[in-house]
Amino acid sequence: MSEIFDAKAFLKTVTSQPGVYRMYDAGGTVIYVGKAKDLKKRLSSYFRSNLASRKTEALVAQIQHIDVTVTHTETEALLLEHNYIKLYQPRYNVLLRDDKSYPFIFLSGDTHPRLAMHRGAKHAKGEYFGPFPNGYAVRETLALLQKIFPIRQCENSVYRNRSRPCLQYQIGRCLGPCVAGLVSEEEYTQQVEYVRLFLSGKDDQVLTQLIARMEKASQDLAFEEAARIRDQIQAVRRVTERQFVSNAGDDLDVIGVAFDAGMACVHVLFIRQGKVLGSRSYFPKVPGGTELGEVVETFVGQFYLQGSQMRTLPGEILLDFNLSDKTLLADSLSELAGRRIHVQTKPRGDRARYLKLARTNAATALITKLSQQSTITQRLTALAAVLKLPAIKRMECFDISHTMGEQTVASCVVFDANGPLRAEYRRYNIAGITPGDDYAAMNQVLRRRYGKAIEESKIPDVILIDGGKGQLAQAKAVFAELDVPWDKHRPLLLGVAKGADRKAGLETLFFEPEGEGFSLPPDSPALHVIQHIRDESHDHAIGGHRKKRAKVKNTSTLETIEGVGPKRRQMLLKYMGGLQGLRNASVEEIAKVPGISQGLAEKIFWSLKH
């Protein structure tokens, strides 16, 4: 128990009503957030002589102050608890590190509706299908839909300004509603309805209607039309036969859990209208000594109750763990959704099969993650030995990206003992320097990054400067001038110069701007971790630079592809029906655009994919 915090006096003031409590350390930082049906009873349990775990002992030893917020109901307390966890990110809570919104397929409400991927708030008029686990799953589905139901996917700006059909029409991927006379309103509306039914899981209705149309076309001796519909029927059947589908038209999330070596993996399977839309693995941050029950309960609460991720609640949630607060969670989710949400932990039949699949995926993902972590640990240990450091707990790496001095962006990526810490990656827009002056850009980003107070835990052990002697000299000069309240001599500054022809494995490392550098063997684990963080920094900088260019010039990512100038860009968008159509096109289809060679088509294809 803390010597400073008077627990006995505090507990006398605590009510027995439901509510939320926040625990603070000596620095005024929230270190734990919890909820309780009975605040007095719950808080008293922290100050018994026989505490439940070492984690609780470590937590209680740091408490200097506790704030209590009383709520009307336990459901209210649960919602408030997860809002506070998201706000404060306390180190003794299990934390779900997932701030991305989930993508949907959007069917617009236009006269001739279009299909597109959508993230974020649902303001536009139309229908939304999903959620999908990631953008790749959406793009894959859109490409498939375009082959079966050829309705447009081009942007409205392209659609409204066409006088003749694009290449998508020529290859049978679009009915061409942009040009009068190519498709009847009735036929286009019918295809849109098929898409709507298909995305709603009503494949049987689609097939029934298509078969009826095929038979009618045959009776009317319209054999070409009948053959076209026959091909469409076969395409729908091929897709539905490949899918893991429940006949019940289920709308549910299936959550499997694996826990080993202090690390947890929670795998979520997204099922809508009986179709598996995809899945995703999560690795919540788990404080040492945390029990599996707390991991699962906290994850599920944060996953659904922190609403900024635009999460869509299913009608049912299947769980691979028997929660102690299952009824409370179901009530809270039902209140949030405005309809009844069921939480099941012992399903049967197809649902048990779903749960087994989620559990298997969680275990597989955890094994892979632990293997990767072991590799990272070995590499960091090897690098620490090379640099003569006791250990490396945190590394930061910087890179600069620009085109002919324009839209300069600096990136900072962070690795900890587990590898990339993507939540702490940062980009810096560089301004007020001579265009193309990489030294000035590095000087500016380092001053912005380190010329302020930094928490002890976030002071890096190693700072990698991508660029060799000149950039390292800038870093040394900046750190010599820093006047900050933290130990500026703690980080080891290391310059990394690319090898001849920029080949991996030939990098030269510099401790000082003067003198000769040194190289590591190409198979050195220490070199591999340097290459990893350097490449991450490079990719992060280029990504930021491309976004900045696209924003400034209001153009697509086509502008960043070498060999694609304004005329070719215009031709590509014109023939493919917009950027979405181009993204979904194959190399062969891109190569059919006038002025695009096979080699350039491959470059465009891979640039848009990656």
Curated annotation (Swiss-Prot):
Residues annotated as domain UVR: 204-239
Q: Which residues form the GIY-YIG domain?
A: 16-94
Q: Which compartments is it annotated to reside in? A: Cytoplasm
In its UniProt record, a GO molecular function of this protein is: DNA binding
GO terms classed as biological process = nucleotide-excision repair; SOS response
**InterPro entries linked to this entry:** GIY-YIG_endonuc, GIY-YIG_endonuc_sf, GIY-YIG_UvrC_Cho, Hlx-hairpin-Hlx_DNA-bd_motif, RuvA_2-like, UVR_dom, UVR_dom_sf, UvrABC_protein_C
Q: Which GO terms describe its cellular component?
A: cytoplasm; excinuclease repair complex
Sorted UniProt keywords: Cytoplasm, DNA damage, DNA excision, DNA repair, Excision nuclease, SOS response
HAMAP family the UniProt entry points to: UvrC
Assembly, in brief, is: Interacts with UvrB in an incision complex.
Q: Which family does it belong to?
A: Belongs to the UvrC family.
NCBIfam families associated with the record? PRK00558.1-5, uvrC
What is this protein's function? The UvrABC repair system catalyzes the recognition and processing of DNA lesions. UvrC both incises the 5' and 3' sides of the lesion. The N-terminal half is responsible for the 3' incision and the C-terminal half is responsible for the 5' incision.
What is this protein called in UniProt? UvrABC system protein C
Origin organism is: Salmonella schwarzengrund (strain CVM19633)
